[in-house]
Amino acid sequence: MKKALFIALVAILSVFTALPALAQSCCTLPKNATDYIAKHFNGYEINFFEKDRDVLDVDYTVYVRNGKLSYKLEFDKKGNVTDIESESRGLPLPQSVLPANVVQYVKGAFPNAKVTEWSKDGNKQLVELNNDMELVFNAKGKFLRIDD
């Protein structure tokens, strides 16, 4: 009985000792992602991030915050940004994260609107405005249509 209890105690202690190393190795962001955050969200604090593994793919979700400004960022396995969403009730995304063609089109066509979400889906870029309108652009930032 004492031997079984001792083995169980050693096993539990081993697990708790290994957890910090395991957490660090499974939850480090790719360099492209950390560079992107440093460039576009300098001064923001990373509140939380997770690594999501599917059968064939890996992606990362990162939440950054600076005062009242909060954003959710998603990256692919190489650290390329795939989605940016404002978590701050209608507050816009930083213009630096958007392609120049997209910024120019939105300013010209919807001068009172702000971009609150951007995502890349294959060869398309999807943009959501604070008026709930969704715009579709090609990979180069050329406007294609308003999405229903």
What are these regions (language model features)?
Residues 103-109, 113-114, 120-125, 139-148:
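Flexible "stalk/tail and boundary" regions
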Residues 45-73, 118-136:
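Exposed beta-strand-loop-beta-strand "reactive/processing" segments of non-cytosolic proteins
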